[in-house]
Regions:
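Conserved beta-strand positions
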Residues: 24, 62-65, 95, 122
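N-terminal binding-site loop/beta-alpha segment at the start of enzyme catalytic domains
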Residues: 1-24, 58, 86
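Beta/alpha (TIM)-barrel catalytic core signal, keyed to glycine-rich beta->alpha loops juxtaposed to Asp/Glu
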Residues: 70-188
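Short, acidic/polar
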Residues: 37-56, 74-79, 103-107
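A short, structured active-site edge motif that brings together acidic residues
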Residues: 17-30, 121-124
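Short, solvent-exposed loop/turn segments at secondary-structure boundaries
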Residues: 34-38, 131-132
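A short acidic, helix-capping loop that chelates divalent metal ions and anchors anionic groups
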Residues: 29-35, 158
Length: 188
């Protein structure tokens, strides 16, 4: 996807880079080995470098850390994000899939570093309103950080994609890690 977007940016939008907001994120498998996943400094910086190369860009506007890392100290992960901003490879940082208490700790670390943390990304749709129930939405408001939804169409369940069964090329049929057949009910 990043290579394709990079080609489109080069071919059609290079004159408009200052008008575009481009983001990317890291936190899941990028390559085999001990540093190909999660939230270590080595992983985050190398992941962003690879993304920038694929995109053909010098920087992104927002770089997200995709998920909390149970093995890497939060200070290391936030320090890596701060280094990325200070190096000019990202203008702002965001977090994704962080719970409320960890979001608060991360925000405090980034504030101390004077790192521009502006947004938190979470699953949010009419079918999944967890962030309203677990206090994360209120935490983000109190911390004065934005929230951006991922999967606002509930992985296609809020479209006509599954009205007539499960298409052979659908996520349920081909992957099933994130959307399972049991999620499709008469109510959904």
């Amino acid at each position: 996807a990043e290579r394709n977007l990079g080609q489109i940016l080069r071919d059609d939008f290079s004159a408009y880079r200052d008008e575009l907001l481009i983001s990317t994120k890291a936190g899941y498998d990028m390559w085999p080995g001990p540093y190909g996943n999660w939230g270590s400094r080595k992983y985050l910086i190398a992941s962003l470098d690879a993304s920038l190369k694929r995109l053909g860009l010098d920087y992104v506007d927002i770089f997200y850390h995709h998920r909390m890392d149970p093995e890497t100290p939060l200070e290391e992960t936030m320090g890596a994000l701060d280094s990325i901003v200070k190096s000019g490879k990202a203008l702002y940082v965001g977090l994704s899939n962080y719970d409320g208490p960890t979001l608060e700790r991360a925000c405090a670390i980034l504030n101390d570093l004077k790192c521009p943390f502006i947004i938190n990304q979470n699953r949010y749709s009419i079918f999944d309103r967890t962030i309203e129930k677990n206090g994360l939405k209120d935490t983000a408001r109190r911390l004065q950080r934005g929230i951006i939804a991922f999967s606002p169409l509930a992985q296609g369940m809020l479209t006509d994609r599954y009205l007539n069964g499960i298409p052979a090329d659908s996520r349920i049929a081909t992957d099933g890690r994130f959307l399972k057949e049991t999620a499709l009910t008469p109510e959904r």
